[in-house]
């Protein structure tokens, strides 16, 4: 537990709540009459309001991207390795905004929030969200903050999809777009993984059609299984082999179906158990559907270059060699489309054994490349 924070930490941070009363029309045909977004900021907004950077989170992410909420916190925010003084997203230079998206379960309005119409948790009645919906809500947040244009919009995985959507939906409001370990749309295999995870939740007897909160229960087993499946896809075979191999938890096999015998089994069960205690099942369903639905090129008969033709930002794409969830080939699809659309783009394929989760890790080559690009951004 830190008693003094590292010099390159943003230190103690406090979330802010922004309330919106103007209805937000959604892609599903419904709307949210009112909603709240939980936000953290790091660094200072300059007088010209030209140094603001938006951080978009991935599936299980949230607003707490850097720093500590308490001196007793065991861990900093989820992207602390990249945000702070002297780090790639340098808070001595940039004013950084990070939020929990609508539909999340970390304070922003979502399935676990009270439905104003009933006074009960929304549960399964919360509307399905899309990446476009999130970007529109983020644009409203920017308006409230007085930010007309982002110096950069940055995200990894699902966050990278939001960054791309920003460049399409609000081309005048983004100077640089950084999409890391991302994709222009999900493959059939990725949709399949998400469906297996959803079925694990939907078929849990404690799910109760999404209204489990009213019964005082949670679909723990379903969430555990969903997280276990997802976590396998976030790591590479090499990373799992190096970390666990075929190591046993105890010295011998038990020859039964109930014991936790292999170290990798123990790890997955721990991850599932921890996740099911902090994440909302309806939010998990919602986030995976937003991933599945993301396909901006569909508006132009699948032509991604035509879709990106409206963008005015400069782009930086990064991928990792062992990421098989969003492989380098998926980032190259975006690069090829941007090149065809005659946009400024740089692409970095980073040799890293960690798989998809590499974008969250303090890999020196990655941090150096990331920081080099961010230094080019004028504020």
From Swiss-Prot:
GO molecular function: homoserine O-acetyltransferase activity; homoserine O-succinyltransferase activity
Summary of subunit composition and partner proteins: Homodimer.
Cellular compartments annotated: Cytoplasm
Pathway assignment: Amino-acid biosynthesis; L-methionine biosynthesis via de novo pathway; O-succinyl-L-homoserine from L-homoserine: step 1/1
Name under which the protein is recorded: Homoserine O-succinyltransferase
UniProt source species: Ectopseudomonas mendocina (strain ymp) (Pseudomonas mendocina)
SUPFAM superfamilies assigned: alpha/beta-Hydrolases
Enzyme class: transferase
Catalytic activity: L-homoserine + succinyl-CoA = O-succinyl-L-homoserine + CoA
Chain residues that bind substrate: 227, 357
Domain AB hydrolase-1: start-end pairs: 51-360
Protein family membership: Belongs to the AB hydrolase superfamily. MetX family.
List of catalytic residues: 157 (nucleophile), 323, 356
Gene giving rise to this polypeptide: metXS
Free-text function comment from the UniProt entry: Transfers a succinyl group from succinyl-CoA to L-homoserine, forming succinyl-L-homoserine.
Enzyme Commission number: 2.3.1.46
